[in-house]
Every structure is written in structure tokens, then in C-alpha cells.
């Protein structure tokens, strides 16, 4: 599958509506193919994970050469302009695009998360943490019509990154430069958005407003909303809602709390708004989601 239509290149502007962007950016995408040289740099609001299986590849990330070694897992926040410049002998490469709100909801090393949101490129110390078989299976399962199978794949990818987090990693590009491309994300914007992401992650379950976020980073609210949407490619309100929905899904799956308690715990203040929002973002009612999750636990016991 090709996710380039969801991305911004250095010589084009993003014209998609925020609502259609959310539907694209909430999805996890996996490509498994031969790498190809990119004619220009591009950027997008997701976390990108690359694993070349049979040879090294070279990227230009924020105008710095980065060698991605065979068998190593490499990840970075893809709002930094990046371009694959040398495919070497590699014929088989996995490319994951992970929604930032999902990445930040997983129990990963806080230093790792901090490095990623501040523009560093991170590489696993160990090789062979992932096989082509797993990548192909996840790619197939993410397109399954069965919600339980799709969620199982997402859970397993989260565990893969948890293993990455625990098994040792190092930064291979520390983003000290301020070079930018025309129409791309400035270092100034990325810095402020990284602060906003941290604040939202800590406070999304409260009565959080856009003004609260803007005040935290000491920016005008309209300016804060503008740079957030430019970097993340969805609105701040959509992002906060996505964090809350992630929390709700976890509590529906893992606890027996009442649905109203769960909604309040995750930061929703109105029962009717919660039901409407959950249905819109997940495609089913909370009751249906809980039932599916319980069935999944019985089908795939931990």
C-alpha cells in the first residue's frame, strides 16, 4: 500500500480537510516492499519505523545523512523532512507509519519518547528483533474486516516497540540544526508542538481546552492551533479526542468499570457527546466494542 498521498512533499501544499486527515492519520499503515529513492523530501505527522531486512539504506533527514543498517529498527517523528537517497542492495524493507496519539499511549521508555518528540532518530542496538513474516501478517491483519484481528495486530506492534524500548537503543541523529525546506515544518514549530504533545498527554483526561495548551507553551491560541495542525496534520481538538478514545478503548477492554465511569475517567464531560464521539471515531458503540474485546480475550487468551 502507498501512503504517499497522506504526506506533504517539500514542493507541495497539503489541501485535505482536517476531518479527512484525521481519518487517515488515526490509521496505522504498514508497507513491506523494496525501498525506492525519493525525488524530494517529504514529511507527515506520524512516527515512522523503518526496518531494512537485507541491506543498508541511506536517508537524508533534515539535510543530515543517516545510515539505517540491515536488521535494525529505526524510528523518528516524520514531521522532520526526510528523503530516502540510497537503497543500496536492499530489496525488502518494512515501513510503519504510526499515529502519534497511539505511540504516546503505549508504555514506552519516557526518555525514548522524549528523544522522538524532540526530533532525534533512534536505532535499536540489537538486530533481528522483527521478521518479515510478522510484518506481512500484521499488514494483512490491519486490513481484516474483523475488528478483533485488527486490534490484535495493533497490540502486537505496540509490544514490538515495548521490546525495542527495553532491549537497548541509541540516538543516531541529534537534531541540532535549524535547516528547513520550503513549505515544511520549522524547528520552531516542532519544538512548540513537542511541548504541546507532552502537556496533552499528561492532561487530556481533565477538562482541557485549547487555551490551556496555548498558555502552557506561552503562545497565542490561534497561533498554537495553526502550528499544531501544520505539524500533526490534524486539529488539536481531534488529537485530544483521539487520546481520550485510546484511553476509553483500553478501559473497555481491560476493566469492568461502567461505561459512564470510563467516559469520565478519560476526560469526557457529557454522556451524549461521549457516545456520539465514540461511534464516530470507532465505528461502533462502547457496548459493542467491550463485547468484541471480551470475545477477543477468550479467543486469544493472554
Curated annotation (Swiss-Prot):
Annotated GO MF terms: DNA binding; DNA-binding transcription factor activity; sequence-specific DNA binding
UniProt DNA-binding region: 211-232, 259-282
GO biological process: regulation of DNA-templated transcription
Acetylation listed as a keyword: no
Segments forming domain HTH araC/xylS-type: 194-292
Keyword entries, A-Z: Activator, DNA-binding, Transcription, Transcription regulation
Job description of the protein: Transcription activator for the expression of the melAB operon. MelR binds at two sites located upstream of the melAB transcription site.
Protein name: Melibiose operon regulatory protein
Native source organism of the sequence: Escherichia coli (strain K12)
Gene it is expressed from: melR
Amino acid at each position: 500500500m502507498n501512503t504517499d498521498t497522506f504526506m506533504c512533499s517539500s514542493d507541495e501544499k497539503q489541501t485535505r480537510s482536517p476531518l479527512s486527515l484525521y481519518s487517515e492519520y488515526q490509521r496505522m499503515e504498514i508497507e513491506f516492499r523494496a525501498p525506492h529513492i525519493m525525488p524530494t523530501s517529504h514529511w507527515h505527522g506520524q512516527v515512522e519505523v523503518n526496518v531494512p531486512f537485507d541491506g543498508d539504506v541511506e536517508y537524508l533527514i533534515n539535510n543530515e545523512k543517516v545510515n539505517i543498517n540491515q536488521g535494525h529498527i529505526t524510528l523518528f517523528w516524520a514531521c522532520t523532512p526526510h528523503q530516502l537517497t540510497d537503497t543500496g542492495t536492499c530489496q525488502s524493507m518494512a515501513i510503519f507509519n504510526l499515529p502519534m496519539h497511539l505511540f504516546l499511549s503505549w508504555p514506552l521508555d519516557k526518555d525514548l519518547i522524549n528523544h522522538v518528540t524532540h526530533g532525534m532518530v533512534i536505532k535499536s542496538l540489537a538486530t533481528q528483533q522483527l521478521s518479515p513474516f510478522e510484518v506481512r501478517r500484521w499488514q494483512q491483519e490491519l486490513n481484516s474486516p474483523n475488528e478483533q484481528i485488527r486490534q490484535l495486530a495493533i497490540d502486537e506492534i505496540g509490544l514490538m516497540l515495548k521490546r525495542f524500548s527495553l532491549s537497548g537503543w541509541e540516538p543516531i541523529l541529534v537534531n541540532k540544526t535549524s535547516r528547513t525546506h520550503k513549505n515544511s515544518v520549522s524547528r520552531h514549530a516542532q519544538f512548540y508542538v513537542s511541548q504541546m504533545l507532552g502537556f496533552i498527554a499528561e492532561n487530556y483526561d481533565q477538562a482541557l481546552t485549547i487555551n490551556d495548551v496555548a498558555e502552557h507553551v506561552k503562545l497565542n491560541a490561534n497561533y498554537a492551533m495553526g502550528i499544531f495542525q501544520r505539524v500533526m496534520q490534524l486539529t488539536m481538538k481531534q488529537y485530544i479526542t483521539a487520546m481520550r478514545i485510546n484511553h476509553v478503548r483500553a478501559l473497555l477492554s481491560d476493566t469492568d468499570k461502567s461505561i459512564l465511569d470510563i467516559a469520565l475517567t478519560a476526560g469526557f464531560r457529557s454522556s451524549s457527546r461521549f457516545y456520539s464521539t465514540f461511534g464516530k471515531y470507532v465505528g461502533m458503540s462502547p457496548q459493542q466494542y467491550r463485547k468484541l474485546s471480551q470475545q477477543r480475550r477468550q479467543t486469544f487468551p493472554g
